[in-house]
């Protein structure tokens, strides 16, 4: 079972915003000048991430920043297999955490244990995936992007670029959010979209599958990947296939920022993972301290944001810092 646990300790100033104030708070914490007088609450984040997915490094970066500011002990664990993810949530319940952040990529497997956490009096916030199920499961709110709307934004961008046939590369079967992204593209794209399923933990296999598809279907002029780590792989497959198809992607990392700059990637759809991590921890602190909550019963949206070559310069700097 793949389990990663990280603990972040820190004392810092009270603020529900990031940026300069958060940096100042972290500096205060390092020097022992804490403004937060709340108890040292323990917050657990349990995600569906597989090993080596850099997206979740960025989420953790935001969560750790907020934890340092809010005097929170932050625990992180993950497993791509839904049953084992549910077991990790149960482990957090057993630890009597003061708050729980969880993803619902495969909601049916998570429903029982999330409701159990709520029944135990643990405030829950869902992030990234599970927007439609979040409220029903008893979560306070959901933080992330509306995946259908994000897909629709991609479809419109492809229309603007004059594209006619796209592959939607699904790297995790059963992930509801990924399926919604492809559905959204199909809603607004005037051309044709074909789903291509690959095993996301096998990058050589991903590259071979994309290359074979591009070689067999010369009408494909776009490959849309659903995660930043797969964009560079798709670009290599395109090169080896001798294809002129454009590679576009959901999410952002350093390689994607570099690809936007050199033209190997056309555009990226960013859902701001740093913000998902930061705001989820900060909102749990606000809720426990003052019963505050954002969204008014609606999801707190962090995306989508279309990023192109014109954004690449600044993005390269931020991705190297680990916050975009």
Which ranges hold each PLM region?
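Structural motif
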Residues: 73-96, 195-217, 231-233
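Hydrophobic alpha-helical
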Residues: 102-119, 185, 200-258
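Bacterial signal peptide processing site
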Residues: 15-18
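C-terminal motif of bacterial Sec signal peptides marking the signal peptidase cleavage site
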Residues: 9-13
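Flexible loop/hinge segments that line or gate small-molecule binding clefts
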Residues: 108-149, 253-261, 265-266, 316
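Hinge/cleft segment of the Venus flytrap/periplasmic-binding protein
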Residues: 23-24, 28-39, 188-189, 279-324
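Hydrophobic alpha-helical segments within soluble ligand-binding/sensing domains
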Residues: 85, 141-166, 204-207, 252-256, ...
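Extracytoplasmic "Venus flytrap"
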Residues: 26-66, 70, 75-87, 104-107, ...
């Amino acid at each position: 079972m793949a389990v990663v646990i990280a603990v972040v300790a820190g004392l810092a100033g009270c603020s529900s915003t990031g940026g300069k104030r958060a940096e100042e708070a972290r500096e205060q914490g390092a020097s022992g000048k804490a403004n937060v007088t709340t108890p040292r609450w323990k917050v657990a984040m349990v995600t569906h991430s597989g090993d080596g997915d850099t997206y979740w490094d960025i989420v953790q970066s935001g969560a750790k920043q907020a934890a340092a500011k809010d005097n929170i002990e932050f625990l992180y664990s993950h497993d791509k297999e839904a049953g084992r993810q549910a077991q990790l949530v149960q482990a957090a319940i057993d630890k009597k955490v003061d708050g729980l952040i969880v993803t619902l990529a495969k909601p049916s497997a998570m429903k029982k244990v999330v409701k159990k956490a709520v029944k135990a009096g643990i405030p829950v916030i869902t992030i990234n995936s599970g927007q439609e199920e979040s409220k029903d499961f008893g979560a306070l709110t959901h933080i992330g992007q509306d995946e259908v709307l994000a897909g629709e934004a991609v479809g419109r961008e492809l229309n603007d670029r004059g594209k006619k046939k796209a592959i939607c590369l699904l790297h995790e079967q059963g992930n509801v959010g990924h399926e919604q992204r492809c559905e959204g593209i199909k809603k607004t794209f005037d051309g044709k979209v074909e789903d291509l399923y690959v095993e996301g933990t096998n990058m050589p296999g991903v590259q071979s599958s994309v290359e074979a598809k591009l070689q067999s279907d010369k009408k494909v002029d776009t490959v849309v990947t659903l995660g930043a780590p797969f964009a560079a792989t798709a670009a290599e497959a395109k090169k080896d296939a001798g294809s002129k198809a454009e590679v576009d992607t959901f999410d952002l990392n350093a390689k994607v920022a570099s690809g936007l700059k050199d033209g190997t990637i056309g555009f990226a759809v960013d859902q701001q993972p740093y913000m998902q991590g930061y705001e989820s921890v900060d909102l749990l602190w606000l809720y426990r301290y003052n019963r505050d909550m954002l969204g008014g019963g609606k999801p707190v949206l962090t995306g989508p944001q279309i990023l192109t070559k014109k954004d690449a310069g600044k993005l390269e700097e931020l991705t190297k810092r680990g916050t975009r």
